Amino acid sequence: MAPPTAAPEPNTVPETSPTGHRMFSRIRLATPTDVPFIHKLIHQMAVFERLTHLFVATESGLASTLFNSRPFQAVTVFLLEISPSPFPTTHDASSPDFTPFLETHKVDLPIEDPDREKFLPDKLNDVVVAGFVLFFPNYPSFLAKQGFYIEDIFMREPYRRKGFGKLLLTAVAKQAVKLGVGRVEWIVIDWNVNAINFYEQMGAQVFKEWRLCRLTGDALQAIDKLNI
C-alpha cells in the first residue's frame, strides 16, 4: 500500500516525549520502499532472539521475494508507526486491500529511541517505525479452511510494554476474521516468558507438547540426494 497522499503536518515535539503525552499509532501495509526498515527490524529481532548466526537476509533478497503477490495471498507485512501527531484519516484508494488501523495512546513514560533516525519513513514528518508483523496463508486441514501463520512479530525495544505490540497481533486477527480465515498461529521461544504471558492474555493457546521440526542448509541438501 502506498503511503497516504495527505501527510501529517511537521511538528516540533522533542524525541523524548513528556510524561502523559498523547501518541498516535498507525498499522499499514508495507511497500517495497519499506524494505530497509524491514531488514533492520528482522536483524534486531535476530539479536533479541540470540539467533544472529542464522541471519543471512539481505535487502535485495527481501525486495525480490516479499512483494510478488497481492497482500494476504502470500507473504504480507504490516508496519507499526508511531507519531506525536495524528495520522491522516483519508484512505489511499490505490490500496483497496487494507484500511490502516489508527489508534491514540497515553504514554506514561518518556520514549528514548537511540535508533530513531534509522526508522524514519519520511524525514519531513515525525513518524517512526516501531515494529512489524510478517505472516502468510497456511491451510489447517482439520478445518478445511485457510489460516494465517505469523512468521515474525517484533517491537523495537523502546516501544515495548506500552500496549503497541498488542496492535500488531490484533490487526492480523481482525484481518483474519474479515477474510473468513479459520485460525491464526505462530511459535514463541520458550524462554520468552513475557511473550508467552502476553499471548495467553490475548486468548491464545500455547501448546507445550508440540515441537518445531526444520530441514535447512546441508540437511536439506542431503535429503535431495536420497534415492527414493
From Swiss-Prot:
One of its GO terms (molecular function) is N-acetyltransferase activity. Residues 77-227 form the N-acetyltransferase domain. Gene3D superfamilies: 3.40.630.30. CDD domains: NAT_SF (cd04301). The keyword Transferase applies. Residues 1-21 are annotated as: Disordered. Coiled coil: none annotated. Induction: By methyl jasmonate, and wounding by the aphid M.persicae, and the lepidopteran herbivores P.rapae (white cabbage butterfly) and P.xylostella (diamondback moth). SUPFAM superfamilies: Acyl-CoA N-acyltransferases (Nat). Its EC number is 2.3.1.-. PANTHER family: DIAMINE N-ACETYLTRANSFERASE, GH14572P-RELATED. Acetyltransferase that converts ornithine to N5-acetylornithine, which is likely used in plant defense. This is L-ornithine N5-acetyltransferase NATA1. The gene is NATA1.
